[in-house]
Amino acid sequence: MDSFDYTTPDYGHYDDKDTLDLNTPVDKTSNTLRVPDILALVIFAVVFLVGVLGNALVVWVTAFEAKRTINAIWFLNLAVADFLSCLALPILFTSIVQHHHWPFGGAACSILPSLILLNMYASILLLATISADRFLLVFKPIWCQNFRGAGLAWIACAVAWGLALLLTIPSFLYRVVREEYFPPKVLCGVDYSHDKRRERAVAIVRLVLGFLWPLLTLMICYTFILLRTWSRRATRSTKTLKVVVAVVASFFIFWLPYQVTGIMMSFLEPSSPTFRLLKKLDSLCVSFAYINCCINPIIYVVAGQGFQGRLQKSLPSLLRNVLTEESVVRESKSFARSTVDTMADKTQAV
């Protein structure tokens, strides 16, 4: 049984050749946690406190705005994905504290980590959807004014959640629990039954659809958007654009270690020194990725307005100011007028 997960929502392995410490008591595990695990626990605790409160506030604000603004629909779904991910943190926290022992049973082993993965991939795909929406606002403003509606936005969000569900299915199907006796513990993880090709195929598909493809989408969309908006004075009011770019940048900075170590572990042999090192850093990489779940509300508040204004306004007011559609609509209309005027000038010249 080569593939087995200790701590992460999906990546990780069990190695039958792990060295058994003969000095370890049979009736209990070591009382000492590794340094990476301790750092992961600290990060998990901070992310849980900030992420649950912050994303709950974003959900509360955008739930009212989503009835009339498309921008709020995007951020509502993104906040829901992050909020649910943060709610699952006590599960990972408990497992690490108990030296990766899984006390929740077999059914929970299949369901709970898979739900964490679902919310993670939903967050990724929603970010790509938001970037595509921003691209259309800048380059197809007239089309957006005619066809960009709340119904279409909700459909796009449903597609993102559906694709995230498909990416999560392997985790649900291949998760099992394994009982160990030296020291006694129950491990929850993914078991591909020595099928390395299947394991690598799943890892590659998730890397492409859950990371590289969204990354390419974001890079293309925002490169063209930045070039276009900064080439015209009339479209340089980009408050929402700055917020989304900050959210996207933070996402890939914090998720990159998880993705890199995950794909490396799927191709390495469990007995290799590199694999063993990555396995020790596993919890830390997951906790680093989880920072993204709590940093988005902070970005929204900081981007709201100047420091003095932040002191004078309440948090809900600041979030409402950032997450509403007004600045986006003004930018789109401004660019549309600029495009029409340019076409008129060319017609007169002919």
UniProtKB/Swiss-Prot annotation:
Modification after translation, per record: Sulfation plays a critical role in the association of C5aR with C5a, but no significant role in the ability of the receptor to transduce a signal and mobilize calcium in response to a small peptide agonist. Sulfation at Tyr-14 is important for CHIPS binding.
Annotated spans, Involved in C5a binding: 21-30
Source organism of the structure: Pan troglodytes
Listed InterPro entries: Anphylx_rcpt_C3a/C5a1-2 (IPR002234), Formyl_rcpt-rel (IPR000826), GPCR_Rhodpsn (IPR000276), GPCR_Rhodpsn_7TM (IPR017452)
Keyword Membrane attached: yes
Protein name: C5a anaphylatoxin chemotactic receptor 1
Entry's Gene Ontology BP terms: chemotaxis; complement receptor mediated signaling pathway; inflammatory response; mRNA transcription by RNA polymerase II; phospholipase C-activating G protein-coupled receptor signaling pathway; positive regulation of cytosolic calcium ion concentration; positive regulation of epithelial cell proliferation; positive regulation of ERK1 and ERK2 cascade
Location relative to the cell: Cell membrane; Cytoplasmic vesicle
Domain of life per record: Eukaryota
Ranges of the Cytoplasmic topological domain: 65-69, 133-153, 227-242, 304-350
Gene, per the UniProt record: C5AR1
Family note: Belongs to the G-protein coupled receptor 1 family.
